[in-house]
Amino acid sequence: MYAARLFVILTFMLMTGCAMNDLPRLQSIERPVDLQRFMGDWYVVGSIPIDTWFASEANAHNAVENYVLTDDGKIQTTYTFRKDGFDGEEQQFNPIGWVHNTNTNSEWRMQFLWPFRSAYLIAYLDEDYQHTIIGVPNRTYVWIMSREPDIGEDVYERLVNVVSELGYDSSLVQRIPQQWSER
């Protein structure tokens, strides 16, 4: 339990820290997000992962983020992946989220451990709700997600280019292998 608390505290500090560049803080998209449509499974196909001495999502396989809107308006989040291979140990995080900007529903807060919160920004979302990019204000981390686990190389490269346009160093993005027989 101590390690989990330490992970949450340090992750929060990293996610809300000062940016090390001259870019303004990352902003979420301006158009409204339909929360019901956004809920469900998102396959994490690429990321600039959290990778520290105390916790790491580097070398994740079969990463999936699931969102469920609860009756009280919170967003129950489950992030699951296999560490170091498709047969690796399953890792799971279960933060609680909520909408911070109710005008657009594109800026959330995530809480892994009370009272610590971190900003969670929907920085890109296609019109069909098939691909999204989630970022943090200081551009330390990013997650590229798709409704399908297997996206073509052209789609993946287009999304990595969007990450670059958002001000991230796209050379840090790691592709997350996905291999599913059925889901």
Question: Positions of the model-derived regions?
Answer:
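Bacterial N-terminal signal peptides that target proteins for export
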Residues: 1-7
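A beta-rich soluble binding module of mature secreted/lumenal proteins
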Residues: 18-183
